[in-house]
UniProtKB/Swiss-Prot annotation:
Pfam families: Zein. GO terms for molecular function: nutrient reservoir activity. Major seed storage prolamin. The keyword Signal applies. This is Kafirin PGK1. Belongs to the zein family. Coiled coil: none annotated. It comes from Sorghum bicolor (Sorghum). The keyword Protein transport does not apply. Keywords: Seed storage protein, Signal, Storage protein.
Length: 269
């Protein structure tokens, strides 16, 4: 009887310890069939615990916290790329403006230094065919100039080939004109020495008119004050006739020289 009571108490103790304990010890002698009976109450008790209930919420919160910096970083990177694009466009526009200003300044300097080269540059930039092949376009322009005005073409070739002419084109052209005048003057000296001497006197006046306009105008005012002309009007008429005859001879010998005679005649009359 006592053994039966003791066995019942032991079995009761095992049942009570199984319901209250959360972990079954490994050294338990309970059979494997008894263990599944204790698992559902343990899991039910664990699910009812506050820490276990808060764990999914903590996971959601941590995931949202981790996702917020990623979104902020993405927004910051997009903003940074936008700012970089805007600054790059502004820098490109500034560079284009600087290049245009440099090009305009160089064109203005070219226009002051060499008007012919400036006009050629303007024609090259305004013509699409000239942009494609500038060398062929320049050759075509030179051929057209040679056919239209051979004298101007020869002068242009001389200006391009002579470094002195490039520095001072006006003086070089005057020298070339005087060299063209010399043969006509030699013929005039052989035909009419008096007219030749008058022409030699007129040449310095013409040079003075080209070099210094003020001095030329002063000389214009002093020319009428000639005592020989004032005293004898016949002398003045004779001199005028000699000058006109010399002009006619020069126009027959050298038409280019006759084009300059209005300047010389203005200095006399």
């Amino acid at each position: 009887m006592a053994t039966k009571i003791f066995a019942l108490l032991a079995l009761h103790a095992l049942l009570v310890s199984g319901t209250t304990a959360a972990i079954i010890p490994q050294c338990s002698l309970a059979p494997n069939a008894i263990i599944p009976q204790f698992i559902p109450p343990v899991t039910a008790l664990g699910n009812e615990h506050l820490a276990v209930q808060a764990y999914p919420g903590q996971q959601v919160l941590s995931a949202s916290i981790l996702q917020q910096p990623i979104a902020q970083l993405q927004q910051q990177s997009l903003a940074h790329l936008t700012v970089q694009t805007i600054t790059a466009q502004q820098q490109q526009q500034q560079q284009q403006q600087q290049q245009q200003q440099q090009f305009l300044s160089s064109l203005s300097a070219l226009a002051v230094a060499n008007q012919a080269a400036y006009l050629q540059q303007q024609l090259l930039t305004s013509n699409p065919h000239s942009l494609a092949n500038a060398a062929a376009y320049q050759q075509q322009q030179q051929l057209q100039l040679a056919m239209a005005n051979p004298t101007a073409y020869v002068q242009q070739q001389l200006l391009l080939s002579n470094p002195q002419a490039a520095t001072n084109a006006a003086t070089y052209l005057q020298q070339q004109q005087f060299q063209q005048i010399l043969p006509a003057l030699s013929q005039l000296r052989m035909a009419n020495p008096t007219a030749y001497l008058q022409q030699q006197q007129l040449l310095p006046i013409n040079q003075l008119a080209l070099a210094n306009t003020d001095a030329y105008l002063q000389q214009q005012q002093l020319l009428p004050v000639n005592p020989l002309v004032v005293a004898n009007p016949l002398v003045a008429a004779f001199l005028q006739q000699q000058q006109l005859s010399s002009f006619n001879q020069i126009s027959l010998v050298n038409p280019a020289l006759s084009w300059q005679q209005p300047i010389i005649g203005g200095a006399i009359f």
